[in-house]
């Protein structure tokens, strides 16, 4: 995330906070607890490395709700996350972590840049999930890294790189099953991880239509099935409705799981 100079503060409880960082989709603020940060989810939408910009009404609150629900659920499955609580519908309290400057992308079906770079046909089901690493650097355009390049750049060591891959594949298994129960296909998605004060790697950032490519199983049309930020990228329209559909299905599935497992 890009660092910005302090701007007008906001108030959380009785504590006044200066903005720490602002990224494309979220703003981070400190809290009274140095181990806790407040994330504000924005309605801003960007694509193509911020070359295309716009607003999606209500996106911040929708993405916050979806992410919170999925983080809570993943915690019950033994996946550590940075989630703590949501004080408001577009705000999330999270554990402070040192973000590893890698975007970890898992692909189940050929789409997006994978098709452009390889010539694979969109919609091709991959024989095995593909894990890719992208260097988080806006100036370089977040380039795709090989395993060896990631080690060469020193962004992490080999043991942690393997941990990131293993965690991503584990999360993918859980999310694929979850979204299938929502009648949605998880095509691909992006994850970010960070290390806490003890050095433990935990899942951070968000899981939402901004970071996942999601297709509606009830729609055969290749445009109508899109339920994610591709609607913004490709000017497909009905962006808010698509995000709302994902939110409704995710929260309904969470309610079903809670009725079976108890509250989480």
From Swiss-Prot:
Look up the record and name the pathway of this protein: Purine metabolism; IMP biosynthesis via de novo pathway; 5-amino-1-(5-phospho-D-ribosyl)imidazole-4-carboxamide from 5-amino-1-(5-phospho-D-ribosyl)imidazole-4-carboxylate: step 1/2
Coiled-coil region: none
The EC code for this enzyme is: 6.3.2.6
Q: What is this protein called?
A: Phosphoribosylaminoimidazole-succinocarboxamide synthase
CDD domains in UniProt = SAICAR_synt_PurC
Its GO biological process annotations read: 'de novo' IMP biosynthetic process; cobalamin biosynthetic process
Single GO molecular function? phosphoribosylaminoimidazolesuccinocarboxamide synthase activity
- Alphabetic keyword roster: ATP-binding, Ligase, Nucleotide-binding, Purine biosynthesis
Q: Which SUPFAM superfamilies match?
A: SAICAR synthase-like
- Catalytic function, reaction form: 5-amino-1-(5-phospho-D-ribosyl)imidazole-4-carboxylate + L-aspartate + ATP = (2S)-2-[5-amino-1-(5-phospho-beta-D-ribosyl)imidazole-4-carboxamido]succinate + ADP + phosphate + 2 H(+)
Q: Which family does it belong to?
A: Belongs to the SAICAR synthetase family.
């Amino acid at each position: 995330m890009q660092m910005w100079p302090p701007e007008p503060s906001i108030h959380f409880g009785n504590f006044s906070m200066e903005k720490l960082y602002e990224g494309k989709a979220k703003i981070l603020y400190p809290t009274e607890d140095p181990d806790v940060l407040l994330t504000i989810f924005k309605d801003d939408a960007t694509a193509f490395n911020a070359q295309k910009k716009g607003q999606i009404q209500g996106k911040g609150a929708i993405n916050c709700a979806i992410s919170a629900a999925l983080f809570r659920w993943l915690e019950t499955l033994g996946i550590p996350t940075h989630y703590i609580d949501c004080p408001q519908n577009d705000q999330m309290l999270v554990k402070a972590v040192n973000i590893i400057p890698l975007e970890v992308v898992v692909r189940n079906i050929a789409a997006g840049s994978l098709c452009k770079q390889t010539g694979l046909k969109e919609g091709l089901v991959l024989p095995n999930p593909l894990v890719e690493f992208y260097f988080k650097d806006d100036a370089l355009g977040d380039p795709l890294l090989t395993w060896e390049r990631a080690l060469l750049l020193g962004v992490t060591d080999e043991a942690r790189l393997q941990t990131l891959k293993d965690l991503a594949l584990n999360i993918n298994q859980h999310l694929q099953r979850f979204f299938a129960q929502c009648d949605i296909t998880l095509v691909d998605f992006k994850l970010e991880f960070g290390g806490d004060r003890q050095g433990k790697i935990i899942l951070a950032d968000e899981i939402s239509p901004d970071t996942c490519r999601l297709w509606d199983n009830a729609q055969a049309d290749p445009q109508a099935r899109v339920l994610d930020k591709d609607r913004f990228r490709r000017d497909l329209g009905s962006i808010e409705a698509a995000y709302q559909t994902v939110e409704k299905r995710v929260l309904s599935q969470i309610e079903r799981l809670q009725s079976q497992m108890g509250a989480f």
